[in-house]
Amino acid sequence: MTSPITVVTGANSGIGRATAIHLAVNGHRVFGTVRAVAKAEKLLATAAEQGVEIELAELDVADDASVERGFADILERAGRVDHLVNNAGVGGNGVVEECSSEQFLDVMNIG
């Protein structure tokens, strides 16, 4: 049986990084999307510490052309995508519990 192929957007930090690592540890082939592959050292180091590999794909969810290029790259390498974790967002200031509804929507509404 082949491993499920999962794409995690915004995998370079926070919840995205933790999700990508968790899925890889649990047998998924994970493609972590990041805006700049050159800045993904922490993601790759954390994966290596856990004994797993995260494959990177450069993708900015706020740029349609970047999304098309990123998914074309993933599909070329993997042939399919079984799961998508749509995690990417812009950073907010403070903790979620203290954000207004408007601030929360600003974090989630990219582009």
PLM features: residue spans?
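A conserved hydrophobic alpha-helix of the Rossmann-fold in NAD(P)-dependent oxidoreductases
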Residues: 40-43, 67-74
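A glycine-rich helix->loop->beta "capping" turn
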Residues: 52-53, 73-86, 92
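Conserved hydrophobic beta-strands of the Rossmann-like cofactor-binding core
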Residues: 5-8, 84-85
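Substrate-binding pocket helix/loop in short-chain dehydrogenase/reductase
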Residues: 95-96, 100-105
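Conserved glycine-rich Rossmann-like NAD(P)H-binding loop of the short-chain dehydrogenase/reductase
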Residues: 26-42
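The beta1-alpha1 cofactor-binding region of Rossmann-like NAD(H)/NADP(H)-dependent oxidoreductases
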Residues: 59-69, 101
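Conserved glycine-rich cofactor-binding loop
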Residues: 12-13
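Short alpha-helix in the Rossmann-fold core of NAD(P)-dependent oxidoreductases
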Residues: 108-111
